[in-house]
Design a protein with these regions (language model features):
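Functional surface patches built around histidine and acidic residues
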Residues: 1-135
Length: 135
């Protein structure tokens, strides 16, 4: 169940959708993150609704034209990605192969996580914002 949220972007009006806990991609991110942690000998992270709300809000701010950086972060830590990254496994693979993102994923002090994802399909292809928040 995707909720269509239209935004007037610089390139024109695009139709954006966000995922939530009813979507398999939401849980696939957690599964992939926890597999990366397990390979590093770490405990799995529990999904947290408040952290997911924060991750979703970060993605929404990117869609609305906010700076794509970590300023204004409201959680202990976050990882973000943007571009034509259409699947949970693809974005998690990207994060796993980035030393800074991998360091966040494998931070042993984290016990919970949240997931946000907003995407748009255009004539040029799919564009996606992903955020995972940690605590």
């Amino acid at each position: 169940s995707y909720g269509a949220v239209p935004f007037d972007l610089a390139a024109g009006t695009e139709q954006w959708w966000s995922i939530d806990s009813s979507d398999s991609a939401y849980w696939a991110v957690q599964e992939n993150i926890n597999a990366i942690r397990a390979a590093a000998g770490l405990s799995p992270l529990a999904m947290d609704g408040g952290l997911s709300a924060a991750a979703d809000a970060r993605c929404e701010s990117f869609v609305a034209g906010g700076a794509f950086d970590h300023s204004g972060m409201t959680t202990r830590s976050e990882i973000c990605a943007a571009g034509p990254i259409g699947s949970a496994s693809s974005v998690c693979s990207y994060w796993q192969n980035s030393p800074a993102h991998y360091a966040n994923i494998t931070n042993a002090s984290f016990t919970s996580m949240g997931v946000g994802c907003w995407f748009c399909s255009t004539a040029e292809g799919q564009y996606t914002y992903w955020t995972v928040t940690f605590n």
